[in-house]
């Protein structure tokens, strides 16, 4: 059965979700990447949209005007780790509950997700056009002076996903755990290979 989160998301909605779970989002998803994070955390500029209980997407979309409305053409995730130095404070200050992006995030985001009850989730890379089909409407846009990729596009989405949980509210970090596991598996294999191919060195 599909696990669907609907905004506004509450802390109790997230307590039973664990890393490696697959979930979907219905409701409000706001594109929000480097400059937005810097403006809030470094420049202390308030975000012109209430993110409390909502979801953000580390993404720089392609949109087009259709009459008096905006239409999503393509919206793929950008590398979440670029926002690592800001994300803990960002979660604390905004009350955002779902951070969608590409790849994992680090210990600061882990701490933020655990302390302030949020999730980091991964949207599959290479599926930007598919993601755009899950955007029902662009309801608002803010900070357009930043250009299309960095503007805040407030989207209404339906069953947006699949989203793989990479950090949960209990401090678990799927990507960090996998790196350790892969290293443990890799080292003895590399040693064995080196015994047979030492002449290449």
From Swiss-Prot:
Identify the keywords attached in UniProt to this record, alphabetized: Lyase
Name residues in a coiled coil.
none
Q: Which SUPFAM superfamilies match?
A: FumA C-terminal domain-like
Against Pfam families, the record matches this protein to: Fumerase_C
Cite the active-site annotation.
37
As one GO molecular function, the record gives:
L(+)-tartrate dehydratase activity
Catalytic activity, reaction form: (2R,3R)-tartrate = oxaloacetate + H2O
Tell me which EC number(s) this protein carries: 4.2.1.32
Assembly notes? Heterotetramer of two alpha and two beta subunits.
PANTHER family for this protein: L(+)-TARTRATE DEHYDRATASE SUBUNIT BETA
Q: What family is this?
A: Belongs to the class-I fumarase family.
Q: What is this protein called?
A: L(+)-tartrate dehydratase subunit beta
Gene field: ttdB
